[in-house]
């Protein structure tokens, strides 16, 4: 049964990805033409933005939006797909700015916007100036995508009241995601592993943003359903926690090929995760000291990363985090089972829930 549910999820996601990619192609081609009339440098930026958004991304958020739309009784899936384009562009805006805040130069297995421009500017500028200028361009690219998000919504062929409700939803999500992002950034410099703060970051930066918001946007697009909005919030809260813990484990123990980011990036950035919280609780003092001295150190080597990984495994922190992810997954599945929606959507939501925890990239 689970294999059949996963097959349906994969088929739906492949379909959504194809449809969203077509819409991205059309949207950015129009923007590139408009930018060319202003300046060739501006045109180049839009070309780079188009290549970046097309290079990676699983299009999970638009897929979830369609599921939320269907669950709420929506039937015009072409219009729902048109609306879900806003989610993918919004997500790209958040990713670009997230990479700037984290100091990352790669995403999707290659250079991100900062990385692309850092390489170009390094040929003519000193290292610090090249990096600053590249990050400035990346911030601009992110802001353009934020603007494009709302532009997509204003051009939808649906009731204006629904468009306004969708805009209000995005504004709330942006405000709350900003809170999660700030808490995440601040936790890296405070160095205090606070469970309540870790869970708050996971809720606002992942659960609400990745799971709850896309589902609720689908409900809004279908005309709204307050009970379903609350149910999706409960579901997203549990699954988002499972997703983030699984993501932390993948980031720590996965390869660059799997994650598209450098191995050990979470260690270098000093990320305060549930995995690290368990490590502090379970490690012997000298073991934790070995981890602590490497957290937030950008100059750690691959050998340092291997050492931290081994300590996390042998201390039981890795296993405890995996159990926590599984517990939240089971809670999410219970919420799905109690939903008053069509069985096909329930089965795909079950498959998506499992995928969030077992995924390898």
Where are these regions (language model features)?
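All-alpha prenyltransferase/terpene-synthase fold signal
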Residues: 1-361
């Amino acid at each position: 049964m689970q294999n059949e549910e996963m097959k349906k999820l994969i088929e739906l996601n492949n379909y959504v990805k194809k449809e969203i990619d077509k819409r991205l192609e059309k949207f950015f081609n129009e923007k590139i033409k408009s930018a060319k009339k202003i300046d060739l440098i501006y045109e180049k930026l839009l070309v780079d933005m188009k290549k970046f958004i097309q290079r990676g991304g699983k299009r999970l958020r638009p897929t979830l939006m369609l599921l939320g739309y269907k669950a709420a009784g929506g039937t015009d899936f072409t219009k729902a797909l048109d609306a879900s384009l806003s989610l993918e562009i919004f997500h790209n805006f958040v990713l670009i700015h997230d990479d700037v805040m984290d100091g990352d130069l790669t995403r999707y297995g290659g250079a991100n916007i900062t990385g692309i421009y850092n390489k170009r500017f390094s040929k003519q500028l000193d290292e610090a100036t090249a990096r600053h200028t590249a990050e400035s361009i990346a911030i601009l690219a992110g802001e353009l995508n934020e603007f494009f998000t709302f532009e997509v919504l204003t051009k939808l062929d649906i009731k204006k009241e629904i468009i306004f409700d969708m805009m209000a939803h995005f504004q709330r999500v942006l405000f709350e995601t900003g809170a999660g992002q700030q808490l995440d950034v601040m936790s890296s410099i405070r160095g205090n592993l606070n469970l309540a703060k870790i869970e708050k970051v996971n809720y606002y930066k992942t659960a609400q943003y990745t799971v709850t918001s896309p589902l609720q946007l689908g409900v809004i697009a279908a005309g709204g359903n307050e009970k379903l909005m609350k149910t999706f919030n409960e579901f997203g809260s549990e699954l988002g926690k499972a997703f983030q813990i699984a993501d932390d484990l993948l980031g720590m123990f996965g390869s660059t090929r799997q994650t598209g980011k450098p191995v050990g990036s979470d260690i270098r950035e000093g990320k305060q995760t549930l995995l690290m919280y368990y490590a502090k609780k379970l490690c012997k003092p000298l073991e934790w000291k070995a981890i602590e001295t490497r957290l937030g150190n950008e100059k750690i080597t691959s050998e340092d990363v291997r050492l931290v990984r081994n300590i996390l495994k042998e201390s039981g922190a890795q296993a405890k985090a995996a159990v926590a992810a599984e517990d939240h997954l089971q809670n999410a599945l219970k919420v799905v089972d109690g939903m008053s929606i069509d069985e096909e959507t329930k089965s795909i939501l079950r498959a998506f829930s499992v995928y969030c925890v077992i995924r390898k990239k």
